[in-house]
Amino acid sequence: MLDVLIRGAGPVGCALALALRNSGLRVALLEASSAPPAFRPLALSYASRLILERLGVWSGLNVSPIERILVSQAASFGRTRLDAADAGVPALGYVTDYAALLAQLRAQVTTTTEVSEASCIVHAEGAPQDTEGKRYAQDAIVGLLQAEPPSTATAFERFTPEGPLALLPLAGRYALIWSMRPERAARLVATSEAEFLRELNAVAGGAIGRGTTIEKRAVQPLALKVRGARVEGNEVYIGNAAQTLHPVAGQGLNLGLRDAWDLAHVLGRAPAAAAPATLARFAAQRRLDAGATIRMTDFLAAGFAGDNALLRAARGAALTALDIFPAPRRFFARRMIFGAAALP
């Protein structure tokens, strides 16, 4: 019998398998589907870089660094700038494509389609289907944008009444993640390139210069789904199987990688992988980081949307305060990078 069966060979499941490879535990990684992933931009935090370096996959990954993030809101006052130097890191994050990261991880693991008995079952197969959660009044359009001038190492996060617009530097272009009303998303994903760029450039407000072409447009529905219990008997839930977040601030995968790293740390040091005390220790260890990240993401997604004078003033005041006072700005940047708990 296996010690650990990991269900789901996405980035989080693969990361856990790699983190356990020298633990002495008998581990299997179960892949249910081999469908090629669609274009999906990822913003990996510096903390995720540290994890991937320890797993031996970082050096082969093509990434574009984010050295600064310019944050603003549309049609109102309030802006701030987050810099890597202020946060004490070489980069705030790194942009890559989901498929590229998955290929690097899959190259170093062995997967199976055979279900085996195991003392501990880890669910890393994606968003929980049996959790209702909260559906945001937003869908996200993702795509690959060419702009003039080309992207450098600056990312843009622009809050609009319908939802946030993120533009992330990726190999001289921008990865686009644009949240908006579902009916508008359905229209814009199907409209002409010229009309799409016209509306995008109007919302971006000249922050990136001018978008000139857009490729790989797709729509993603947005919801917050949080599993009630991270541990149930000998079963553990990590990554999107434990919590599915809004893409604002790019926290979802980074939180999932921290889940995997902490679980590997706990399982690798335990005399029995599925012992109740072992799994309870993992759940307690993840409570602060996961809870704080979920609340922050939900606040940014829902609390920073809406279009009335009071909300605009509150958003503007919050951004202005971050811009004026370096201590809270550094705290916010490091919280986005490392979560609410440092790496073990």
List each model region and its residues:
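Glycine-rich FAD cofactor-binding loop and adjacent beta-loop-alpha segment at the N-terminus
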Residues: 3-5, 9-67
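Active-site flanking residues adjacent to catalytic metal/cofactor-binding acidic residues
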Residues: 7, 30, 122-124, 239-240, ...
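Hydrophobic anchor at the start of a short beta-strand
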Residues: 25-27, 121, 174
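Conserved N-terminal helical subregion
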Residues: 50-54, 58-144, 148, 152, ...
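Conserved FAD-binding catalytic core of PHBH/FMO-like flavoproteins
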Residues: 123-219
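FAD/FMN-dependent oxidoreductases across multiple families
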Residues: 187-274
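C-terminal helical "tail/cap" subdomain of flavin- and related membrane-associated enzymes
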Residues: 265-344
